[in-house]
């Protein structure tokens, strides 16, 4: 099963726009078609960002439900290698650390420009749209 790491912006976008590519990406995880890989640092970022005032309009029950699904069904890892200088935003290095430890196939982000490389130790860095297109191609084969 494909292993994916999901950037916080994808989670937020999925909750804001339930018919969007980020939402479709998360639905693949929820349906069991891929495995989301998480570290404590990433999950904490999810919680902190979703608790911000500007996201108070989100359906609180949906937020709790999604976080609960992550808690129960994700592949949890503790990164052994710390990365300091790959992503343009220092906080984004946590996603690379998780991907490296989990041997993830994809890191999915809406902020592709934060990652100056398209691949990091065999993890492909893609947008939700690119990921969905790749999944469609895999299903056709």
Residue ranges with predicted function:
Residues 7-8, 38-39, 111, 127-128:
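A secondary-structure boundary/capping signal
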Residues 6, 22-51:
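PIN/NYN-family metal-dependent endoribonuclease catalytic core
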Residues 72-112:
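Active-site neighborhoods of divalent-metal-dependent phosphate/nucleic-acid chemistry enzymes
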Residues 1-19:
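Metal-dependent nucleic-acid phosphoesterase active-site entry motif
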Residues 86, 100, 105, 112-141:
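Acidic, PIN/NYN-like endoribonuclease modules and their adjacent C-terminal/linker elements
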